[in-house]
Amino acid sequence: MSNTHFHCRKLKNKLMLTLSFLAVFFGLFWLCWILFTLITKGIPALSLELFLEKTPGPGEKGGLLNAIIGSTLMITVSTLIGTPIGILAGTYLAEYGRYSQLTKVTRFLNDVLLSAPSIVIGLFIYAIYVSQVKHYSGWAGAFALAIIIIPVVVRTTDNMLNLVPNNLREAAASLGCPQWRVITMICYRSARAGILTGVLLSIARISGETAPLLFTALSNQFTSFDMNGPMANIPIVIYQFAASPFQDWNELAWAGATLITLFVLLLNIFARIFFPQKSK
C-alpha cells in the first residue's frame, strides 16, 4: 500500500511540474514573440532623423522629435506632481494613521484607483478640465498621468515604510527625536531604495499610456514646448501611424514602440542595479 501511495505522489508531482513548466513556457513564448517582432521591425526603423525631425505628412520623410519632446514634458510634469503626493500619502498611511479606520478605507480606495482602467482617468480629466477650458492641452495629459502615478507611489511608499523595523523608530524616540525627524532621517533612509524603485516603475508604466492622452493631450504635427495646447506624444503617434495605410508611417510607429520598450527596459535595469532590494 505504501509503495502505491509513493508512486501516486510521484506521479502527481511530475504532473504538477509539467503543468508549471507549460505555463511558464506559454507566457515566455508570447513575450519572446512580441520582442522578436519588435526587434525585427523596430530596430531597422531607428535612425538619427528620428530624433531630429518632426512627424511627417503622408509620403514625406520625418522623425519623432515633437512626439519625444511632448512625451518627455508630460512625463516629467506628471512625475513632479504625482511623486510628492504619493510619498506623503504613503507616509501618512504607514506612520501617522497606521491603526486608524481612515487608513484602511484609504488603502482600499487606493487599490481601486491602482486597478482602474486608464481610459476612465482620461475621461475624468476630460470632464473636469478639458471640457471647461474648451481645448486639449499637455497640462491635461500630465494631470491624467499624475493620477496614474499617485496610487503606485502610495502603495510602494506604504509597503516600504512598513518594512522598516519598529526598533529603529523606538530607539530614535527614546533619544527625544520628534516623529517627523524619525520619519525623514531614519524611515526614509531605510526605505529609499524601495520608494525610488516604485517611482521609476511608475514612470515606466505611464510611458506607454495611450488611452488617457486621447482625451487630454491629443496630438499635433508640430514641435512645441507649449503645454497649453494639444501636444504630440509617442503613444498617440504609434496609435495613429500603426493604423495608417502608409508604409513610412508604419515604420515610424514601430520605431516609436521600440523607443518606449527600450526606455522601460533601461528604467527597470537602472532600478535593479542602483536600488537593489535587500534580502532579509
UniProtKB/Swiss-Prot annotation:
Question: Where in or outside the cell?
Answer: Cell inner membrane
Using the record's annotation, list all stretches that form the ABC transmembrane type-1 domain: 68-271
What's in the GO CC field?
Answer: plasma membrane
Q: Which PROSITE patterns match?
A: ABC_TM1
One molecular function GO term is: phosphate transmembrane transporter activity
Q: How does it sit in the membrane?
A: Multi-pass membrane protein
Q: Which domain of life is it from?
A: Bacteria
Q: Which Gene3D superfamilies match?
A: MetI-like (1.10.3720.10)
Q: Which Pfam families match?
A: BPD_transp_1
User: What are the UniProt keywords, alphabetically?
Assistant: Cell inner membrane, Cell membrane, Membrane, Phosphate transport, Transmembrane, Transmembrane helix, Transport
What InterPro entries does the record point to? MetI-like, MetI-like_sf, Phosphate_PstA, Phosphate_transprt_permease
Sorted alphabetically, the Gene Ontology BP terms of this entry are:
phosphate ion transmembrane transport
Q: Does the keyword Cell inner membrane apply?
A: yes
What residue ranges are annotated as transmembrane? 19-39, 68-88, 108-128, 133-153, 195-215, 251-271
Instruction: Quote the function comment for this protein.
Output: Part of a binding-protein-dependent transport system for phosphate; probably responsible for the translocation of the substrate across the membrane.
**Protein family according to the UniProt entry:** Belongs to the binding-protein-dependent transport system permease family. CysTW subfamily.
How is this protein named in the record? Phosphate transport system permease protein PstA
